[in-house]
């Protein structure tokens, strides 16, 4: 089992798919990495030898920001926006959409579960 960037690659998957299990690597980056290392993207992860795993590990660690470092960079970026109190930072703080989407209806994913407010009862005549 190949272990790259602290993640065990799934054995039975093709290398181009297995690499996407690493946070920060998608399909296009996975193909790019395969091309740089000269390993066939269709090769199964279980068929990689130590030399190929070391090549992959070396390229990923030197050229790409992945896993924990990427997560912390994103968190720091969001924290900076919140600290300088810009519009995007305020929207992050309130848990609302950032990019101009409507919030009167929709935006449920960002706002969370509905919070019902009791209606005022109409006075009986």
Curated annotation (Swiss-Prot):
It comes from the Bacteria. Keywords: Ribonucleoprotein, Ribosomal protein, RNA-binding, rRNA-binding, tRNA-binding. One of its GO terms (molecular function) is structural constituent of ribosome. InterPro entries: Rbsml_uS13_C, Ribosomal_uS13, Ribosomal_uS13-like_H2TH, Ribosomal_uS13_bac-type, Ribosomal_uS13_CS. Residues 101-125 are annotated as: Disordered. One of its GO terms (cellular component) is small ribosomal subunit. Transmembrane segments: none annotated. It holds the Pfam family Ribosomal_S13. One of its GO terms (biological process) is translation. Part of the 30S ribosomal subunit. Forms a loose heterodimer with protein S19. Forms two bridges to the 50S subunit in the 70S ribosome. Located at the top of the head of the 30S subunit, it contacts several helices of the 16S rRNA. In the 70S ribosome it contacts the 23S rRNA (bridge B1a) and protein L5 of the 50S subunit (bridge B1b), connecting the 2 subunits; these bridges are implicated in subunit movement. Contacts the tRNAs in the A and P-sites. Belongs to the universal ribosomal protein uS13 family. This is Small ribosomal subunit protein uS13. The gene is rpsM.
